[in-house]
Amino acid sequence: MADEERVVRCYLDLDVGDPEEHAERAAEHENAAQYIQRKGHQLGLDTNLKPSELDEEQRDLVREACASDPEFGAVVFDEPEPLRAGRLVLELFAGKCPKTCENFRCLVTGERGVGKASKKPLHYKGCRFHRVVRGFMMQGGDVVKGDGSSGDSIYGGKFNDEKPGLKLRHEGRGTLGMANSGKNSNTSQFYLTLAEGPLKQLDGKHVVFGRISPESLPVLDAVEARAFAGGVEGEEGEQPAVPIVIAGCGVLGEESS
């Protein structure tokens, strides 16, 4: 019984946003800060002010001055939101679904190298959540193509469903399950549920093998909100408006629940 309750704790550090766009906005924010500090007195500004503390009239003055000064150029006044949305801690039901959980564990550590057929790293680091459906789920883990059309596993491609995982229910927000294309077609793709209540339509069709730890649920909330910033949801309402990337991942430890 103790072995059935074995839990492995893993983590996914998620970045949300376009890195190039973020770097550009950060540079423009620094432009504004540097101008205020070095030349703000020419506009009658307190040089100790932060860009975000300027009123609209002051912002217009700085914007116009920087546009005509080749040393500075474009500016933004509000500091861009950090790319790092936070850490999701996942509790894997290793006692109930040992094969599925071992596959996931190895994919977060990257310890198995590259796939024999795919020749791609068996590692979630750098993978995107390519599909996010508001109030339903977010799906990622395609270590081969990154777009949800493929996947791989430490077992050399597809592996079978574990019956105990098929019996577990999607009981609420933060359930961790295996994405598939039918019976016994598990690879590396997985999903996290975003629905507050049960998702009975998924029960018995997908292997449930873990959950988000309660302390990580606020991070999930933040990721879902930022995924649809500005109301853009892709052509079919399933694409995040900005990239959601697993920037880091690993194992935290093992315990009995």
Residue ranges and their predicted role:
Residues M1-S257:
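Cross-family detector of peptidyl-prolyl cis-trans isomerase
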